[in-house]
C-alpha cells in the first residue's frame, strides 16, 4: 500500500513538472534543424534520382545506372 502511494505521488510530480516545462518553452525552439524538412522546395521532394555525373552509392539512386561510383 505504501509503495503504491509513493508511485502515484511520483507519477503526479513528474506529470506536473512536464506540464510546467512545456508551458515555459512555448514559442521557443532550440533545435531549428529539426524542422528543416519543411523548407525543402517542391523540386527537391519530387526528384527521386540523381542525374548522370553525380556520385552514387547505396543511399542515392541514379536516373540511369551507377557505375564506379558515378551515375551514367
From Swiss-Prot:
GO cellular component, alphabetical, reads: extracellular region; host cell presynaptic membrane
- Highest taxon of source: Eukaryota
An example of a Pfam family matching this protein is Conotoxin
Regarding tissue, the record states: Expressed by the venom duct.
One GO MF term: ion channel inhibitor activity
Q: Where is the signal peptide?
A: 1-22
- Would the keyword Cell wall biogenesis/degradation turn up in this protein's UniProt record? no
Where it mainly occurs, coarsely classed, is: secreted
What subcellular locations does the record give? Secreted
User: What keywords does the record list, in alphabetical order?
Assistant: Calcium channel impairing toxin, Disulfide bond, Ion channel impairing toxin, Knottin, Neurotoxin, Presynaptic neurotoxin, Secreted, Signal, Toxin, Voltage-gated calcium channel impairing toxin
Query: Which PROSITE patterns does the UniProt entry name for this protein?
Result: OMEGA_CONOTOXIN
InterPro entries per UniProt: Conotoxin, Conotoxin_omega-typ_CS
Would the keyword Signal turn up in this protein's UniProt record? yes
Does the entry annotate any disulfide bonds, and if so which pairs?
49-63, 56-66, 62-71
Q: Which residues form the propeptide?
A: 23-48
Q: Which family does it belong to?
A: Belongs to the conotoxin O1 superfamily.
Job of this protein: Omega-conotoxins act at presynaptic membranes, they bind and block voltage-gated calcium channels (Cav).
Q: What is known of its domains?
A: The presence of a 'disulfide through disulfide knot' structurally defines this protein as a knottin.
Q: What is this protein called?
A: Omega-conotoxin-like 15
Amino acid at each position: 500500500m505504501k509503495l503504491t502511494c509513493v508511485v502515484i505521488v511520483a507519477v503526479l510530480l513528474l506529470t506536473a513538472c512536464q506540464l510546467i516545462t512545456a508551458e515555459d518553452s512555448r514559442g521557443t525552439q532550440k533545435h531549428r534543424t529539426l524542422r528543416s524538412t519543411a523548407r525543402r522546395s517542391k523540386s527537391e521532394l519530387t526528384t527521386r534520382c540523381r542525374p548522370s555525373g553525380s556520385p552514387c552509392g547505396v543511399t542515392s539512386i541514379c536516373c540511369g545506372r551507377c557505375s564506379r561510383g558515378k551515375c551514367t
